[in-house]
Amino acid sequence: MAQILKGAPVVAAMNEANAARCAALKEKGIVPTLAVVRVGAREDDISYEKGIVTRCGKVGVEVRQFHLAEDVTQEELLDVIRQINGDASVHGCLIFRPLPKRFDDRRVQEALAPEKDVDGITDGSMAGVFTNMPIGYPPCTAQACLEILKYYNVPLSGKRAVVVGRSLVVGKPAAMMLDRENATVTLCNSRTRDLPALCREADVLVVAMGRRGAIGADCLREGQVVVDVGIHVNEEGKLCGDVRFDEAEPIVEAVTPVPGGVGTVTTSVLVGHVVDAAS
């Protein structure tokens, strides 16, 4: 049976490190601070925000919440972002998305200063990921995949890594970050020919297709480490991933669970970015 790569121990280790770094910064008079910008009152946004506030509080990061009415104009939202950009006491900013359809999403993203883009949504942050330059921050979910692999001492240098999914949120940045660790990376998508055969070649398989149960036994072999980024609700109302866990567990060497895997680590990555920005 596979080793289950749970996110909880990774989170605990990251929280401990972030708390120590926060304490050191506060001794210098610096309080790491995150601005959270939310338009409207979607239940999932509110729930996620509560989780962020709790996680930040545990390590000593201050949170400033900017709650805007559902009917706020784009210019009013941009004014808030400009205010955050100009406030030296705010080190990072998280803008809840998706925004209402009337907004120019790209214009809003690019209004944020890359040095405060702790969620990795700006072109500047993407440039940093793809050029390995210290510009902005990687998308949190992509980095969470790497944090799990590093915590569990999964060797990457010289290994074959296959990433299934090419979004700018997970797939492409994860591929670049694996390449930075000297893995040989293949980036696939839903139209890749003979996808199962390519997946079976992987030593490390990262699945971020956004399709429930898309990867099963025909894509897997013994000795693999599988990172499942997907999160869905099945017919029974239970959370599940892009990988059919019941088929993967008896075959592979190690696999992340859903829930309890990548998703649990993402917020700690965000908090770590805020501390980095304050340092």
Model-identified regions with their sequence ranges:
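Anion-binding alpha/beta catalytic cores of soluble intermediary-metabolism enzymes, centered on
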Residues: 92-156
